[in-house]
Amino acid sequence: FFIKDKKPDQKKKIIFINTEWCNTCRVMYRTTFSDTAVSSLLSKHFELVNFNPETNDKLYFQDKEFDNIHSKELPFHQLVYALSRNGLLFPQVIFMDEKNTVVDAIPFYLNPNVFKNIVRFYGEDIYKTKNWETFIKEQETK
């Protein structure tokens, strides 16, 4: 996904920012992303991209080049700072629309039940017509 001259493919993206040393990241990957209902919703609405912010690869996003400069002040890949609204919190899930615009960035572990609702909220474009609180209240009454 983060390669040079990559054309948008008109599919929404979920960027899962995680590191090898993050236990919570591994648990979320093992429990949340492997949940059958979550997996079904993801494949229907999104392309899932795993992103380790400690990579040394040169990456490209929105026609810009990003590196991991390994400085004391910026110990992670520059791209994680460009994508995240929440700073360096792991795990973190970035939701993007079809034009690769960041719609939301949600940090920390999300269990399958919560994540299913979030995936529906963004995957089905509900966020464009309702706020999160209204959407959740409607889900609770079903």
Regions found by a protein language model. Name each.
Residues 1-13, 42:
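A short beta-strand-turn-helix
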Residues 102-142:
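Thiol-/selenol-based redox modules, centered on thioredoxin-like
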Residues 48, 79-82, 88-106:
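A short, hydrophobic beta-strand/beta-hairpin element that forms part of a small beta-sheet core
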